[in-house]
């Protein structure tokens, strides 16, 4: 019986060899694609996590109508929170695009430079890389913001604008019409004092939860958890 089955199987393979070869080829290609996609996804996830850690990606942000007082900021930092002012002003450029101006970041959502350096003088600026590409801006290029000329000293990105949407409700990124720029504190204050921005300054704070905060959270969780079980 086994001999008959072997002969039949062998005959079937010979008669349909092209079909089985095609099937084997498809299986191999499918396995290759799956392994490639998994490997690529793992690389992207790992790379994103490393960049987030390196450039201090925020744990969250909140917006207020008026800036926090020094006392309020101190109270938050004492609870184990690192705060960063990510206030911004929007300006309309001559080509019709909108440029969102921030101060240089220091502690949270730090600038990831692809080229050049941070702005150190009031006449210098770092431009978001996609906007720079769409507007042919390079290191050493000049850009006019609110009538003043700025020299591009850096090109890069920030983790909170990984996809550079103007609004959270936007469905697509249009770097030809919207971009980011980072200037010194003095340059930012001058732009604010001129009062020529499209709208009033937006007061947004980015924050990171420190180890102290996490320890407090988990200690509270393990104290409360046994009681919740019997609630």
What does each of the following model-derived ranges do?
Residues 2-231:
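Membrane transport/envelope proteins' first extracytoplasmic loop
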């Amino acid at each position: 019986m086994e001999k008959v089955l072997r002969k039949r199987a062998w005959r079937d393979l010979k008669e349909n060899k092209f079909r089985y070869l095609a099937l084997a080829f498809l299986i191999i290609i499918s396995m290759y694609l799956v392994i490639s996609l998994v490997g690529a996804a793992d690389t992207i996830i790992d790379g994103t996590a490393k960049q987030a850690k390196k450039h201090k990606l925020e744990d969250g942000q909140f917006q207020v109508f008026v800036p926090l007082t020094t006392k309020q900021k101190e109270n938050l930092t004492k609870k184990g929170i690192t705060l960063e002012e990510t206030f911004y002003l929007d300006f309309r450029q001559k080509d019709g695009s909108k440029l969102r101006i921030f101060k240089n970041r220091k502690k949270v959502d730090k600038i990831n430079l692809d080229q050049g350096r941070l702005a150190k003088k009031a006449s210098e600026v770092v431009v978001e890389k996609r906007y720079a590409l769409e507007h042919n801006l390079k290191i050493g290029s000049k850009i006019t913001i609110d009538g003043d000329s700025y020299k591009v000293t850096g090109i890069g990105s920030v983790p909170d604008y990984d996809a550079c949407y103007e609004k959270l409700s936007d469905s697509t990124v249009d770097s030809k019409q919207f971009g980011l720029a980072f200037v010194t504190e003095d340059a930012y204050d001058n732009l604010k004092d001129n009062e020529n921005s499209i709208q009033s300054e937006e007061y947004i704070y980015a924050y990171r939860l420190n180890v102290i905060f996490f320890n407090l959270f988990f200690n509270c969780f393990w104290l409360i958890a046994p009681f919740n079980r019997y609630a």
